[in-house]
Amino acid sequence: MKEFDYIIIGGGCSGLSLAYELEINNKLKNKSLAIIEPRTDYKRDKTWSFWKTINHNFEDCVIKNWNNFSINISSKSHELKTKNFPYQTVNSDLFYKKINNELSKNKNIYLFKNVNEINTKDALIFNSAPESNANKSKLWQHFQGVEIETE
């Protein structure tokens, strides 16, 4: 069984972001990396939204920016401008394609999908898989909406 220098458990946003940053910053030169992901394929399965407080490498995956928002309570409304800290939404499909395209150029990076066992001997392991009690948070941000596409 092949041995790896690094193993990332979880090939979602966190795990793939870590692998991407290691690769583009030349930290994987002469190193092997295994990414373990339970899903069998990547598709647009979600969007990620956040306040942009620093520059990041995924501007080309951003599908929407908001520079203001409003807080509405009963009959009151207050609009806030956030030009310096826009709220951004990243499309997971664009993100997965960008990352996997870059990582596939390095023959020492292996993406294992739907794997039950891997040799972890002498490997540095990064576990980005959520803990089983991760959804017990008291604060949850959720948006409901409809996407409409027109020709």
What residue ranges belong to the model's regions?
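Beta1/beta-strand and adjacent pyrophosphate-binding region of the FAD-binding site
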Residues: 1-14, 34
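Nucleotide donor/acceptor-binding cores
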Residues: 4, 30-31, 123-124
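Anionic group-transfer/hydrolysis microenvironments
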Residues: 7, 39, 129-130
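Predominantly flavin-linked oxidoreductase catalytic cores and closely associated redox partners
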Residues: 11, 21, 25, 102-151
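Conserved Rossmann-like nucleotide-cofactor binding loop
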Residues: 14, 41, 131
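N-terminal FAD cofactor-binding segment of flavoenzymes
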Residues: 17, 21-77, 94, 144, ...
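Generic domain-boundary/flexible-linker signal
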Residues: 44, 82, 136-137
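A conserved beta-strand/loop capping segment in the N-terminal third of enzymes
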Residues: 50-113, 118-122
